[in-house]
């Protein structure tokens, strides 16, 4: 169980700034970094210039994320010159890549701490080492640890929380670097997961998102085995919990038991993120996804049959090596058939160290961009159509705060994950309320509390 942080009575010894790139797992890692530092006596600042410690928590899933890290590190050189006592640390998946830590140290010698994903829990020790010995730390642990429990955590949100149920991935999709930087699959025990959720409920949290690179593989490494469907049922029975979400699911492992659990468990939200990556069976085979188009559509059909009002989202890669116009057309036709509520779309990006990086039939950049734009146009049309169907309906919304676009309105999300901006009572923040949807927008809904 992770420790919920109470920062009362801690003597302040400095300020820290964290910048995070990447997925929800990285976001939770940053919450743990923040928790550890606050326990040491630091306070968080949102201004780099005010910080005594600056931490970059990096991502390497796509090239663009790495380029952002390089650019931002370059900016820090000036800050370090002005304040030689500033401590700069870089961690995360990008650092876990073979040779990357040494590259960063060579390009940016002013960086004080470089660590990977497997020794994050030791960050306070490394920080103290730098401060006391006036030295730098470069420690990349190649082998993953057993799971570290009871880490302090500084949650960004007071009503919704991420709870990691497993770490790592065993799938080795040919384009993906994750198994190399996050290690093999390791599951937390259901007892530790339940204990963390119960603690969160006692702190006032209403919604939990269960995290893992492939949550459907949960429990296979435990003795005795516990299936993901069984875990969902156990979590659903926790008293006081209002909502449960999870991500990410791998289509090859999404069993009938899991679909049935979502349909029957009242706290499980009717929202499933099911990355397809491509609609072409030929490309899926090259990606090593372990399913084909027919299998994926069969899973979707089962989901829609048991959960008629489900909102489906997905990930799609455009321009994977060898993708022909025919392959891309198959992706478009699958998108139209499934009718996703939303999608994360990406241009294929070569990841050094993955099998796909060596594939010779790379797709030209201009072709990738044209296909990407065509795909986004289709997805946006479908999303607008799906949102339009909400007009006139009454939806349960967890009120998260005031709207970013209009401080006189509130904002929150439906059980299906739709963003709703609505007129309501500010006393409702943190509560579940019923909202009548008045208008559908391209990427959100507008309504009024009833």
Swiss-Prot record:
Binding site for [4Fe-4S] cluster 2: 169, 173, 176
Any one GO CC term of the record: cytosol
Entry EC number(s): 2.8.4.3
Cofactor(s) required, per the database record: [4Fe-4S] cluster
Record CDD domains: Radical_SAM (cd01335)
Domain of life: Bacteria
Residue ranges constituting the TRAM domain according to the UniProt record: 388-450
UniProt entry keywords in alphabetical sequence: 4Fe-4S, Cytoplasm, Iron, Iron-sulfur, Metal-binding, S-adenosyl-L-methionine, Transferase, tRNA processing
Domain Radical SAM core positions: 155-385
Coiled coil residues, start to end: none
Location(s), subcellular: Cytoplasm
Cited SMART domains: Elp3
GO molecular function list: 4 iron, 4 sulfur cluster binding; metal ion binding; N6-isopentenyladenosine methylthiotransferase activity
Protein purpose: Catalyzes the methylthiolation of N6-(dimethylallyl)adenosine (i(6)A), leading to the formation of 2-methylthio-N6-(dimethylallyl)adenosine (ms(2)i(6)A) at position 37 in tRNAs that read codons beginning with uridine.
Record protein name field: tRNA-2-methylthio-N(6)-dimethylallyladenosine synthase
Lineage summary: Bacteria, Bacillati, Bacillota, Clostridia, Eubacteriales
């Amino acid at each position: 169980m992770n420790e919920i942080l109470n920062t009362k009575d801690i003597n302040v010894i400095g300020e820290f700034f964290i910048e995070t790139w990447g997925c929800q797992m990285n976001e939770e890692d940053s919450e743990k970094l923040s928790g550890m530092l606050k326990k040491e006596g630091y306070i968080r600042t949102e201004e780099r210039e005010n910080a005594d410690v600056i931490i970059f928590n990096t991502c390497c899933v796509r090239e663009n994320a790495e380029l952002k890290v390089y650019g931002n590190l370059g900016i820090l050189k000036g800050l370090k010159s002005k304040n030689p006592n500033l401590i700069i640390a870089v961690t995360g998946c990008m650092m876990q890549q073979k040779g990357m830590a040494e590259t960063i140290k060579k390009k940016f010698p002013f960086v004080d701490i470089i660590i990977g994903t497997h020794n994050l829990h030791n960050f306070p020790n490394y920080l103290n080492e730098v401060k006391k010995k006036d030295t730098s730390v470069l420690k990349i642990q190649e082998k993953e640890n057993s799971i570290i429990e009871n880490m302090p955590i500084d949650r960004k949100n007071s009503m919704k929380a991420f709870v990691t149920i497993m770490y790592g991935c065993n799938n080795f999709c040919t384009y993906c670097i994750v198994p190399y930087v996050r290690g093999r699959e390791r599951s937390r025990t259901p007892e530790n997961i339940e204990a963390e959720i119960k603690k969160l409920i006692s702190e006032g949290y209403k919604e939990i998102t269960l995290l893992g690179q492939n949550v459907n593989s949960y429990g296979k490494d435990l003795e005795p085995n516990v299936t993901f469907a069984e875990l969902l049922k156990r979590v659903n029975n926790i008293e006081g919990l209002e909502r449960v979400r999870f991500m990410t699911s791998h289509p090859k492992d999404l069993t009938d038991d899991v679909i049935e659990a979502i349909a029957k468990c009242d706290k499980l939200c009717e929202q499933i993120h099911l990355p397809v990556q491509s609609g072409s069976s030929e490309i899926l085979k090259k990606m090593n996804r372990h399913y084909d188009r027919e299998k994926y559509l069969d899973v979707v059909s089962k989901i829609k049959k048991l959960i008629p009002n489900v909102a489906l989202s997905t990930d799609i890669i455009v321009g994977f090596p060898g993708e022909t116009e025919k392959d891309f057309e198959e992706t478009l036709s699958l998108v139209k058939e499934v009718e996703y509520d939303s999608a994360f779309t990406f241009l294929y990006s070569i990841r050094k160290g993955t099998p796909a990086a060596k594939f010779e039939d790379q797709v030209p950049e201009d072709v990738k961009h044209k296909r990407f734009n065509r795909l986004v146009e289709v997805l946006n049309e479908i999303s607008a159509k799906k949102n339009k169907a909400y007009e006139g309906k009454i939806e349960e919304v967890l009120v998260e705060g005031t709207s970013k676009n209009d401080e006189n309105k509130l904002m929150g999300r439906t059980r299906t994950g739709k963003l709703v901006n609505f007129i309501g009572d500010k006393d409702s923040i943190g509560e579940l309320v019923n909202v009548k949807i008045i208008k559908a927008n391209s990427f959100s809904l507008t309504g009024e509390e009833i």
